[in-house]
């Protein structure tokens, strides 16, 4: 009699336990691929741009990026540029590919003194600058200027190469959220991507994100 009661108790407990497990698994599986912090940071840096248009929508490329080098880069500049291209291709190379070309470019990166920054229609006070053009929020052309003036340390130039090329992907805003992020608003010497920087690039070129999306649409698709 006692053994029967024990058996019934065990069956009852198992019946309670397994539905709970099933519910837990469904809840876990229904979670978004991205955290709230990642989504919040993405909407901060990917909607609109620091300069120019104030329209808060997604802009990005839908074709491979071909980069032509102009001006007078030094050896370290070229090493940095190649490393940044490699880093970006590692993140989104299955979506779009970045490469260096001698002609038929859609990005010009200009290593020039500040006195020649008019090439990029640069806002005053910048030692690195990007200026992109788009149609229907699809980017098709960019000019990047990197200052070669002696006042700059190589570490600063290398930082700006990474920052300006990354932002020309469509992540056009700065932020004060993460000091070591390539998108940090104040002057830094960041030489590599944080994991959250990589995530921002990944999200922008994910299948969920489309040119012209507004904040509500972005948040909705990323939370699914």
What residues fall within each predicted segment?
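Bacterial N-terminal signal peptides that target proteins for export
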Residues: 1-10
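C-terminal motif of bacterial Sec signal peptides marking the signal peptidase cleavage site
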Residues: 18-20
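Disordered inhibitory propeptide/activation segment of secreted metzincin zinc metalloprotease zymogens
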Residues: 22-69, 73-75
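Catalytic zinc-binding patch centered on the HExxH motif and its immediate surroundings
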Residues: 56-60, 76-77, 114-140
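Acidic helix-start/capping segments at beta-turn-to-alpha-helix junctions
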Residues: 65, 69, 97-118, 185-186
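Zn2+-dependent metallopeptidase catalytic core
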Residues: 75-99
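Metalloprotease/metallohydrolase-associated module, dominated by Zn2+-dependent proteases
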Residues: 126-156, 172-224
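Active-site recognition of the HExxH zinc-binding catalytic motif
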Residues: 159-171
């Amino acid at each position: 009699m006692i053994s029967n009661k024990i058996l019934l108790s065990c069956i009852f407990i198992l019946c309670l336990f397994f539905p709970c497990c099933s519910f837990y698994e469904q809840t876990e599986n229904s979670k978004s691929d991205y955290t709230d912090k990642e989504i919040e940071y993405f909407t901060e840096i990917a909607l609109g741009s620091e300069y120019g248009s104030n329209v808060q929508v997604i802009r990005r490329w839908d074709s491979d990026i071909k980069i032509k080098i102009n001006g007078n880069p030094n050896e370290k500049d070229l090493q940095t540029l190649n490393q940044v291209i490699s880093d970006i291709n590692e993140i989104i190379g299955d979506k779009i590919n970045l490469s260096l070309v001698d002609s038929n470019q859609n990005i010009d990166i200009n290593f020039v003194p500040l006195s020649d920054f008019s090439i990029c229609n640069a806002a005053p006070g910048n030692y690195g600058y990007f200026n992109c053009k788009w149609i229907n929020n699809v980017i098709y052309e960019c000019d990047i200027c990197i200052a070669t003036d002696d006042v700059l340390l190589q570490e600063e130039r290398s930082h700006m190469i990474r920052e300006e090329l990354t932002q020309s992907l469509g992540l056009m805003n700065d932020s004060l959220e993460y000091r070591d992020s390539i998108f940090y608003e104040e002057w830094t010497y960041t030489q590599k991507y944080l994991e959250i920087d990589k995530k921002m690039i990944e999200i922008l070129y994910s299948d969920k994100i489309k040119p012209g999306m507004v904040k509500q649409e972005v948040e909705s698709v990323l939370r699914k």
